[in-house]
């Protein structure tokens, strides 16, 4: 996981003249980017015909026949 390190005075960027000195921090950076960039680069994107197609699902429910029968027996209301 990446960390953001706190800044210190020696890592501050100074701008402006000596009379009016402003400071801006530029030392916050990602320390470990290997997991960020190395995630799923080897996996290919799906082909156009495969997008939106679900894999086969097995429903293990003893009441599924009763539920489906009850849904098909009801007439749609308001039609």
Swiss-Prot record:
Residues 43-69 are annotated as: Inhibitory domain. One of its GO terms (molecular function) is calcium-dependent protein kinase inhibitor activity. Keywords: Cytoplasm, Nucleus, Protein kinase inhibitor. InterPro entries: Camk2n (IPR026779). GO terms for cellular component: cytosol; nucleus. It is found in: Nucleus; Cytoplasm, Cytosol. This is Calcium/calmodulin-dependent protein kinase II inhibitor 2. It comes from the Eukaryota. Potent and specific cellular inhibitor of CaM-kinase II (CAMK2). Traps Ca(2+)/calmodulin on CAMK2. Belongs to the CAMK2N family. Pfam families: CaM-KIIN (PF15170). It comes from Xenopus laevis.
């Amino acid at each position: 996981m990446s960390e953001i390190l706190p800044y210190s005075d020696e890592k501050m960027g100074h701008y402006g003249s000596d009379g009016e000195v402003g400071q801006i921090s530029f030392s916050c950076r990602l320390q470990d980017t290997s997991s960020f960039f190395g995630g799923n680069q080897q996996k290919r994107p799906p082909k156009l015909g495969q997008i939106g197609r679900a894999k086969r699902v097995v429903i293990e429910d003893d009441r599924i026949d009763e539920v489906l029968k009850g849904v098909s027996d009801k007439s749609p209301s308001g039609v």
